[in-house]
């Protein structure tokens, strides 16, 4: 007996993945009037972004300019030229530097996603010529997840080990309040209010609704997507791309109810994350990891390189000449009460004096 032919659906744009890149593409396309479907293989949307700090490096962004931190484009261009060395591509870098601020303004003006500034956060390599002492970073502002309604519980919660009883703590000023809660009355009162609200959220919603960091970034994007009619489907991995006459026309998606063929008139966006949990790809691209099992990643466990393989199936080529194919940080393995093992990233610790890693 022949296997049943997948049912067929149609849209203008199909987005594979549901992190910040995926949802940014979905929201932008929907704002321009396209019918968009987002498919996510995990049971919850948000990807690694939902676990992240939610920070973005966007020189000359509107928040910095509003604070009086104005610089010519040549400054960050020079910084990146020195940082990237022989991999510097001026056309790409200029495209990023020119369109990054436009992106921030678009989301501020047209979506639920808002931002807080990082005007006192310096560039990573402060001794590089044309590095800045601040004004080049932004972060998602706290977001009230009650706006998500019945899709709240489809949002991936923050990594448990980075929270206080499941409550996310925003980096920057809020984190300083928590560190000073037993020393400064203002900090104690600030923390008390947040803890009381979180307790109420647990009673009413079974999870926190004041989202911060990467969770806020996903919350704001998801709310905007839903408001624009974007469909976000979880438990729906893309298994292969559809092609016709040399172009990608859609994808076959495995859903809880069987395979669905989604035809996308304008194309497919591959935004399903990297390859931190793909040993074969790590073995190929990380010379110091000869078996592909030398590193533990704090990235989403669903990041197994699916998008790269899908791209290769359509003739794409994954660059193999990168100076460094991974962003590395110390990770601890934390045994949870249920027997599972969490991968805890020591991101803050990287900046502490005396760290050896």
Annotate each predicted stretch with a short phrase.
Residues 1-76, 115-357:
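Residues forming the flavin
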Residues 62-64, 68, 76-88, 95:
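Eukaryotic low-complexity, mixed-charge intrinsically disordered interaction/regulatory segments enriched
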Residues 78-82, 95-98, 109, 177, ...:
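Charged/polar, solvent-exposed surface patches and flexible loops
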Residues 81-90, 201-208:
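Short glycine/proline- and acidic residue-enriched helix-loop micro-motifs
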Residues 83-123:
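Long, well-ordered early-domain segments
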């Amino acid at each position: 007996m022949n296997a049943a032919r997948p049912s067929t659906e149609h849209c203008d744009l199909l987005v594979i993945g549901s992190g910040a890149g995926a949802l940014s593409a979905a929201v932008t396309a929907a704002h321009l009037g396209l019918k968009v479907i987002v498919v996510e293989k995990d049971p919850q949307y948000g990807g690694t972004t939902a676990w992240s700090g939610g920070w973005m490096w966007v020189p000359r962004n509107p928040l910095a300019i509003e604070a009086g931190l104005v610089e010519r484009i040549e400054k960050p261009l020079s910084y990146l030229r020195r940082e990237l060395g022989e991999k510097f591509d001026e056309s790409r870098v200029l495209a990023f530097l020119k369109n990054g601020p436009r992106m921030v303004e678009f989301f501020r003006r047209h979506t639920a996603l808002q931002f807080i500034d990082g005007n006192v956060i310096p560039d990573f390599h402060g001794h590089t010529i044309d590095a800045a002492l601040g004004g080049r970073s932004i972060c998602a502002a706290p977001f009230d997840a009650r706006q998500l309604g019945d899709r709240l519980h489809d949002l991936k919660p923050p990594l448990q080990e980075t929270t206080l009883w499941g409550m996310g703590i925003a980096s920057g000023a809020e984190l300083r309040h928590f560190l000073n809660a037993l020393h400064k009355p203002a900090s104690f009162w600030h923390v008390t209010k947040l803890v009381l609200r979180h307790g109420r959220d647990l009673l009413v919603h079974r999870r926190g609704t004041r989202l911060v960091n990467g969770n806020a970034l996903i919350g704001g994007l998801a709310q905007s997507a839903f408001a624009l009619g974007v469909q976000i489907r979880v438990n729906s991995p893309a298994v292969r791309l559809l092609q016709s006459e040399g172009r990608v026309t859609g994808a076959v998606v495995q859903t809880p109810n069987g395979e669905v063929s989604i035809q996308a008139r304008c194309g497919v966006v591959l935004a399903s994350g990297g390859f931190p949990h793909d040993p074969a790809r790590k073995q190929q691209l990380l010379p110091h990891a000869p078996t592909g099992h030398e590193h533990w990643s704090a990235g989403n466990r669903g990041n197994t390189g699916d998008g790269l393989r899908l791209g290769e199936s359509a003739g794409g080529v994954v660059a193999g000449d990168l100076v460094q194919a991974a962003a590395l940080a110390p990770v601890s393995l934390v045994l949870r009460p249920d027997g599972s093992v969490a991968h805890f990233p020591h991101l803050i610790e990287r900046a502490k004096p005396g760290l050896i890693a």
